[in-house]
Each structure stands twice: as structure tokens, then as C-alpha cells.
Amino acid sequence: MEINGTLIEDTFSEAFTGRCVRATITARDMETVRRAALDATATPGAVIGRVEGGVESFLGGEDTPDGRPGAVVQFYYALDDMEKFQVELSYRIRQDILVKPFTALYSSTPDPDGYLDMMKHVGHCGDGYEWLEEFNGREMINVPVAVPDFKIESRMGYREAIMGANFWYMCRDPDTVLEAGRAAIRAIEEVEGVVTPFDICSAASKPETNYPWIGPTTNHPYCPSLKEVLGDESRVPEGVGYIPEIVINGLTMEALEEAMRAGIEAVCRYDGVLRVSAGNYDGKLGDHRIDLHGVLG
């Protein structure tokens, strides 16, 4: 298959099941919202047993629970230990959202499978002076802080979701890495229910490693700088000098497939993109398979 002269390999992306909390951050102004949203979702850590997240969209006051500027963010956890998820999520909330002036956080997860209690690891930042209050049908924790006050919904809904869907766009030159990648991110941002936790990712990884205490390490057959060293083991095609990756997490498979299609079609508008592929690891990463040709029809 080709799109605009770009070869689409007959392969698939492997993805895996996780848990997602979808939430809405609000603040007095959009600059504060943006800083809180980007800070809270800045470190993708699912492959090392931590939380990872992304910004789904930014909102005007007409679309938020309290009429202020806002952002929809998603936080993902790949393990079934919900207590650990609660702790890891609290770090993002406490260190990146609560500390920003005039912020609030509301649960926005559609059809939640369950809830994470926010009092133990976030509400008690008030050192016992926090209190509960009702706001527009939501139970909120008011955490007293020096710039009054941080408010967070007492329970955050979570649901099963899908993590790690991906595609690689193999480029001839460095300008195309950035230009095509940014076009893909913009296209994916138009799809509801998905995030790109790594933005443009320069470091595709693999499950096998010589250093297990690190976790996933570089996918060496796809490193252009190792092509001569590896010889026949190298999987870097002729003419390709760069293999960036776009990783997508989503609430549903339908949203993920729509995002994959939008992103791939976007990169294929650039002459410097020679082919598109995806990461899969013989089922070692996850139990979801997204065929590139199937997604593109």
C-alpha cells in the first residue's frame, strides 16, 4: 500500500490494556491551565511502572464545570494495582496542579469502571484543615493553600483503556522528522479520547534488554547510526536516516484507530517520509493488534 508515494508496510502496532483517569483542569487564566496540564503530563512512565499522561484538548469556560478556562488530560497506568495508581497519580496532582494558583480538578472519565479516592493522598495535603463541599452536584475537597484554595473532586473515575498504539514514519532528513511529526500531532489532537504521551518520540524501544534494571532499551535494529555496525541485522531501509515514532493512548479502540489513520495520513503529505511502519514484539508487549492496512482501508 502507498499513500502519496509513501510505502505503508503490511504490519501492525501492538498495544496493551491499562487504566485511565480522564480529568479536567481549570484555572483563572489559560496560561496557568496550560502550564498545569503540560507539567502534569510531562513524563511518560508506563513502561517503568509509573503513570503517563497527555493533554487531550484545551477548553473555553463554556465547556468546563466551573466556567473557567480548562484542559482535558488523561493519566494512564499499565498495572492492576489501583492503590499504586492512586499514589502515582497523586504525585502529578500535588506537584504539578495543586501548586499552580487558582486551580481545580474535576473527574471527566466517561462510563467509569470505578473510582480513586482523592482524600488520602491529595486532600490531606490540607493537613487536616481540608473540608468537603458540594459544587454543581459534585463532591469537592477544598484544600486550603496560601493562594486560596485548591479544589479537587473527591473521587476520580477510571476506566479500562488502551496504551502503546504506535506508528513509525521513516524520514530522509531531519526537517521532515519535525515538520511531519508536528503535523501528525495536530491531526491526532482533533480526535476525541486520545493523547500522545511522548509527542514526537526519538527513541523507539524493545522489551528485550541486556540491562533489565533499566527497563526497555533502544530498538537497536532500527537505529540508523548502527546500520554499518549491525550489517544484516539492521532493519533501517536504504535512504532512511531517521525513524521517529508517534505513540497514542486512547479510551477506546475506535478512537485509537481514528487517531492512527489521521496521524499516518498527515505524515504521508511530506515528501521526506519514505515509509510508515509500526512497533510489534510477537505479543510480548500487549494483546491488542492494530493493522496499518486495516486502519487505512
From Swiss-Prot:
Descriptive protein name: Formylmethanofuran--tetrahydromethanopterin formyltransferase-like protein
Protein's GO biological process: one-carbon metabolic process
Molecular functions per Gene Ontology: formylmethanofuran-tetrahydromethanopterin N-formyltransferase activity
Pfam families: FTR (PF01913), FTR_C (PF02741)
Keyword Transferase: yes
Keywords recorded for this protein, A-Z: Transferase
Family statement drawn from the similarity comment of this UniProt entry: Belongs to the FTR family.
Gene encoding the protein: ehaS
SUPFAM superfamilies the record matches: Formylmethanofuran:tetrahydromethanopterin formyltransferase
InterPro entries: ForMFR_H4MPT_ForTrfase (IPR014053), ForMFR_H4MPT_ForTrfase_C (IPR002770), ForMFR_H4MPT_ForTrfase_fd-like (IPR023447), ForMFR_H4MPT_ForTrfase_N (IPR022667)
